[in-house]
Structures are given as C-alpha cells and as structure tokens.
Amino acid sequence: MSHETGRLIVEMVRAGRRPSDIMTRNSFLNAIIAVAAVGGSTNSVVHLLAIAGRLGVDLALADFDQAGRDVPLMVNLQPSGEFLMDDLYRAGGVLAALSQVKDLFHREAITVTGRPFVEYLLDRPVYDDAVILPRESPVMANAGIAVLSGNLAPNGAIIKPAAATTALLQHVGPAVVFDSIEDMRARLDDPDLVVTVNSVLVLRGCGPRGYPGMPEVGNMPLPRKLLEQGVRDMVRISDARMSGTAYGTVILHVAPEAAAGGPLAFVRTGDIICLDLKGRSLSFDVSDEELQRRETSAKSQAAYAAPTRGWAKLYVDHVMQADTGADLDFLVGASGDEVMRESH
C-alpha cells in the first residue's frame, strides 16, 4: 500500500491533479451521504466543515441536513444496530454498503485516481445481508445527521437520529443544568438531585472556547438513581462533541457555545426545553425579554475565565464555533498554488 500510495502521488503531480480538483463541493456532499448511509459519527460535521473552509469550498451546516435527510441507513452496526465493525468488513465492507445507495451520489466527483467515485461502487458483492441490508429494507429510512435550530441554538445544533431513542425525538421537559464537566461529575449521582426521566440534562462550558477544545463529553452519563430505575436514555444537550460509538438522544455542537455568550449560557434549571426533530427545532420556554435580562445580569458577573497566555490563548482567541467547523479563523480560505521560499 505504501508503494502504491507513493506511485499515485507522483502520478498526481505529473497529471496536475490537485486537492482542489478532488475535494469539490459535490465531493463533500458525497461524504455527507456516505456518513448517513453507514451511521457515521457526528464528528464528521466539524471535520468536513473545517476541511471545506481551508479549501474555500462553500459548505454550511444546513447542507448536512439537506444532503443526508433522505439517505437510508444501510448497515446494521452498533450503536444503531446489532453487529460490530469486523462484521461489516466480512460482509463486504464500506464500499459494498455504499453501493446500495450509489444512485444518491454525485457522479462527477472524482477520487485521487481521477476516476469518478461512483465507479468504485460497481460490482460490490454483499456477503451477509443481515449486516449490510438491502435497499428496500434499511435499518432506518432517513438516517442523516439532523440540524436543529431555535432560541437555544440560533446558529444550529446537531443530533444523530440513528443513535437516538425514537420516542424521545419529540420531547418537552425541564432542564437540569451543569456548568462544567466538573460540576456534572460532582452532582450527577447525588441522591438529592432533582431529576426525573422527563428531565433534559444540559452541560455547558464544553465547546471550542469553553473547555477549551470541545471534548467528547456530550453523551453525559445518566444519574445513578435513574439507572437503578431502569432508565437507559434521556435527552441531553451540550456544546461538546461525542464519540461515533456512543448511543443516546444527545444534542451536540450547540452554537454559539456558552463561553461565546450563546443562549446555552443562560439556561437555568427548571426551564422547559422542547426538542422537535420533525420540525428541526430546539428551544426553551423563555421570553426574549427574560433572556435579555439574564444576559445583562451575566455580563455584570464574573466573565468567562479565558486562558491568558500560550497556545491556549491563541486557540481561544481564534477558534471558530462548531457550526463553521471549529477551526482557527486565520486558516480559512484556499492557500492557492504559490510555492513558498526554500528554507535550505
């Protein structure tokens, strides 16, 4: 593989085939479709947005909802199904799974070889249709990562329906708010914590600036006393990320994050939160006037304690929000083909 990779790189240079020829808008849309078809990670959202930003490719959070909404989930893998990654490999692999939805991809998008991506989806046998399902009977008909918005997430938030509990995708419940990971760990299992199965767990201070670095803690654990009652999922909201192997009705990447002054910073325990997947809405029952009062009050209190020196300061001063890829703002935009000065 190393030899073949080196050979291909030389061939690309000789042919003048550049990354910008390969990573076009349609290629990014194909990536979104592929993620939906295999139940891929929510992390793909920030990764693809950041890469597109560095190439100067027009890609927005809304594209994930639009491109992935009608894509069926073709693989019966955990956390959305039964099997494991090794089972997918033995059943034919990712390309066999994507071949089931090959008609959905943009045909003009090419790969590093210069050939259209869809050519690699032809003649891909499936060896186990319990793992890679037929097109007519997918695990889920609409598996794409959903983009939510509302007064709790003006610039958007995301949820992975394929990993969620269907009954919780339309939900109204009171917030139980944690200001940080440390606050959550200190209070979550307190027997006196006022929380029920209908509560919505809210974790803030875990976004790109707030942590800093946007850790994978969005799929926060459930309170012990509810686990002992047999509860296995609850609606959870945060400005953090979560692992692609995690399960649950978890709303992530809330933008703007709390540390950037987003409405998530002003949610209080007891506020009623409404999740409406069908309507792509995430809101809390607080008037604009009350929200303004809370924001004004917060400004009069101690400000978010941002780092004051070193890489951490550079990072928080320049990191963008999750809805635009959480990249550093000075790295956005194509670099062009200028050859830099030799350093030797």
Model regions: which residues?
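Catalytic or ion-coupling anion/metal-binding cores of large enzyme and transporter domains
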Residues: 1-257, 262-344
